[in-house]
Amino acid sequence: MSEEKIYTKFAPNAEKNLVIEVDGEKYERFPVRLPVIMDGDDIYTIIKDAVEGYATADDMIYVSEKIVAISQGRAFKVDEIKVSKLANFLQKYVTKTDVGIGLGSPQTMELAIRELGRVRILFAAAVAAITKPLGIKGAFYVICGPKARAIDGPCHYTIPPFNNYAKLAPKDP
Protein backbone atom coordinates (compact mmCIF):
# COMPACT_ATOMS: atom_id res chain seq x y z
CA MET A 1 0.00 0.00 0.00
CA SER A 2 1.38 3.39 -0.92
CA GLU A 3 2.45 5.80 1.82
CA GLU A 4 0.23 8.48 0.25
CA LYS A 5 -2.86 6.28 0.63
CA ILE A 6 -2.07 5.61 4.28
CA TYR A 7 -1.62 9.33 5.02
CA THR A 8 -4.93 10.09 3.29
CA LYS A 9 -6.90 7.41 5.15
CA PHE A 10 -5.46 8.29 8.56
CA ALA A 11 -5.24 12.08 8.34
CA PRO A 12 -4.92 13.86 11.69
CA ASN A 13 -7.01 16.73 12.94
CA ALA A 14 -5.73 20.07 11.63
CA GLU A 15 -3.89 21.00 14.84
CA LYS A 16 -2.17 17.61 15.25
CA ASN A 17 1.03 16.23 13.72
CA LEU A 18 1.42 12.68 12.47
CA VAL A 19 5.08 12.57 13.50
CA ILE A 20 6.07 13.34 17.08
CA GLU A 21 9.42 13.15 18.82
CA VAL A 22 9.82 11.72 22.33
CA ASP A 23 13.24 11.41 23.97
CA GLY A 24 14.97 11.73 20.59
CA GLU A 25 12.85 8.98 18.98
CA LYS A 26 10.41 9.81 16.19
CA TYR A 27 7.01 8.16 16.09
CA GLU A 28 4.33 8.24 13.41
CA ARG A 29 0.80 8.39 14.73
CA PHE A 30 -2.08 7.40 12.50
CA PRO A 31 -5.50 8.30 13.93
CA VAL A 32 -8.13 5.72 13.03
CA ARG A 33 -11.70 6.84 12.45
CA LEU A 34 -14.16 4.45 14.04
CA PRO A 35 -17.94 4.35 14.27
CA VAL A 36 -19.40 5.69 17.51
CA ILE A 37 -18.71 2.96 20.07
CA MET A 38 -21.72 1.91 22.14
CA ASP A 39 -22.33 -0.27 25.21
CA GLY A 40 -21.66 -3.89 24.32
CA ASP A 41 -19.64 -3.22 21.15
CA ASP A 42 -16.70 -5.54 20.50
CA ILE A 43 -14.02 -2.87 20.19
CA TYR A 44 -11.29 -5.42 19.42
CA THR A 45 -13.09 -6.54 16.26
CA ILE A 46 -14.09 -2.99 15.27
CA ILE A 47 -10.49 -1.76 15.57
CA LYS A 48 -9.03 -4.86 13.91
CA ASP A 49 -11.34 -4.37 10.93
CA ALA A 50 -10.50 -0.64 10.74
CA VAL A 51 -6.72 -1.17 10.53
CA GLU A 52 -6.72 -4.37 8.49
CA GLY A 53 -4.42 -3.95 5.51
CA TYR A 54 -2.63 -1.00 7.14
CA ALA A 55 -1.25 -2.13 10.49
CA THR A 56 1.74 -4.45 10.67
CA ALA A 57 2.84 -6.86 13.38
CA ASP A 58 5.32 -4.24 14.66
CA ASP A 59 2.72 -1.49 15.04
CA MET A 60 1.31 -0.48 18.40
CA ILE A 61 -2.35 0.45 18.57
CA TYR A 62 -3.59 2.67 21.39
CA VAL A 63 -7.22 3.09 22.32
CA SER A 64 -8.73 5.79 24.51
CA GLU A 65 -9.98 4.60 27.88
CA LYS A 66 -13.24 6.41 27.14
CA ILE A 67 -14.27 4.03 24.34
CA VAL A 68 -13.24 1.01 26.41
CA ALA A 69 -15.41 2.25 29.31
CA ILE A 70 -18.32 2.99 26.98
CA SER A 71 -18.16 -0.49 25.42
CA GLN A 72 -18.25 -1.97 28.95
CA GLY A 73 -21.38 -0.05 29.95
CA ARG A 74 -19.45 2.26 32.29
CA ALA A 75 -20.77 5.53 30.82
CA PHE A 76 -23.96 7.08 32.21
CA LYS A 77 -26.27 9.86 31.03
CA VAL A 78 -25.73 12.71 33.47
CA ASP A 79 -29.44 13.46 33.75
CA GLU A 80 -30.08 9.85 34.85
CA ILE A 81 -27.50 9.82 37.67
CA LYS A 82 -29.30 10.21 41.00
CA VAL A 83 -27.02 12.52 42.97
CA SER A 84 -26.70 12.11 46.75
CA LYS A 85 -26.45 14.98 49.23
CA LEU A 86 -22.87 13.91 49.92
CA ALA A 87 -21.89 14.19 46.23
CA ASN A 88 -23.58 17.60 45.99
CA PHE A 89 -21.67 18.80 49.05
CA LEU A 90 -18.23 17.41 48.16
CA GLN A 91 -18.13 18.50 44.52
CA LYS A 92 -18.15 22.14 45.64
CA TYR A 93 -14.63 21.70 47.03
CA VAL A 94 -13.07 20.18 43.91
CA THR A 95 -10.58 22.51 42.23
CA LYS A 96 -11.87 23.28 38.75
CA THR A 97 -9.27 23.09 35.97
CA ASP A 98 -9.39 23.42 32.22
CA VAL A 99 -8.15 19.86 31.63
CA GLY A 100 -11.52 18.30 32.40
CA ILE A 101 -14.43 18.11 34.78
CA GLY A 102 -13.02 15.30 36.90
CA LEU A 103 -15.01 15.08 40.12
CA GLY A 104 -16.08 18.73 39.90
CA SER A 105 -19.70 17.97 39.10
CA PRO A 106 -22.33 16.36 41.34
CA GLN A 107 -22.74 13.50 38.85
CA THR A 108 -19.06 12.61 38.59
CA MET A 109 -18.62 12.86 42.36
CA GLU A 110 -21.60 10.51 42.72
CA LEU A 111 -19.93 8.01 40.40
CA ALA A 112 -16.78 8.21 42.56
CA ILE A 113 -18.81 7.51 45.70
CA ARG A 114 -20.45 4.49 44.06
CA GLU A 115 -17.19 3.18 42.63
CA LEU A 116 -14.92 3.71 45.66
CA GLY A 117 -17.33 3.74 48.59
CA ARG A 118 -18.46 6.46 51.00
CA VAL A 119 -15.83 5.65 53.63
CA ARG A 120 -12.87 6.04 51.27
CA ILE A 121 -14.31 9.23 49.73
CA LEU A 122 -15.01 10.74 53.17
CA PHE A 123 -11.53 9.82 54.43
CA ALA A 124 -9.93 11.36 51.32
CA ALA A 125 -12.07 14.50 51.70
CA ALA A 126 -11.07 14.84 55.37
CA VAL A 127 -7.37 14.51 54.55
CA ALA A 128 -7.74 17.03 51.69
CA ALA A 129 -9.52 19.47 54.02
CA ILE A 130 -6.48 19.36 56.32
CA THR A 131 -3.72 19.35 53.69
CA LYS A 132 -5.10 21.83 51.14
CA PRO A 133 -4.83 24.88 53.47
CA LEU A 134 -1.22 23.83 54.12
CA GLY A 135 -0.50 24.12 50.40
CA ILE A 136 -0.52 20.38 49.78
CA LYS A 137 -2.74 19.75 46.79
CA GLY A 138 -3.97 16.46 45.36
CA ALA A 139 -4.23 14.41 48.58
CA PHE A 140 -7.83 13.48 47.74
CA TYR A 141 -6.80 11.89 44.44
CA VAL A 142 -3.74 10.20 45.97
CA ILE A 143 -5.98 8.44 48.51
CA CYS A 144 -8.74 7.64 46.02
CA GLY A 145 -6.30 6.44 43.36
CA PRO A 146 -6.48 5.97 39.60
CA LYS A 147 -10.15 4.96 39.54
CA ALA A 148 -11.10 8.41 40.83
CA ARG A 149 -8.66 10.21 38.52
CA ALA A 150 -10.13 8.40 35.51
CA ILE A 151 -13.73 9.49 36.15
CA ASP A 152 -14.72 12.10 33.62
CA GLY A 153 -17.78 14.17 32.90
CA PRO A 154 -19.43 15.48 29.77
CA CYS A 155 -17.67 17.99 27.56
CA HIS A 156 -18.47 19.83 24.35
CA TYR A 157 -15.73 18.15 22.29
CA THR A 158 -16.93 14.58 22.93
CA ILE A 159 -18.89 12.89 20.14
CA PRO A 160 -22.67 12.75 20.76
CA PRO A 161 -24.41 11.19 22.53
CA PHE A 162 -21.49 10.92 24.98
CA ASN A 163 -21.13 14.68 25.31
CA ASN A 164 -23.94 14.29 27.88
CA TYR A 165 -22.43 11.32 29.73
CA ALA A 166 -20.12 10.78 32.69
CA LYS A 167 -17.86 7.74 32.66
CA LEU A 168 -15.95 5.53 35.03
CA ALA A 169 -12.55 3.98 34.37
CA PRO A 170 -12.61 0.83 32.26
CA LYS A 171 -13.09 -2.40 34.18
CA ASP A 172 -10.10 -4.72 33.69
CA PRO A 173 -8.86 -2.91 30.56
What are these regions (language model features)?
Residues 2-173:
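N-terminal and secondary-structure boundary signal
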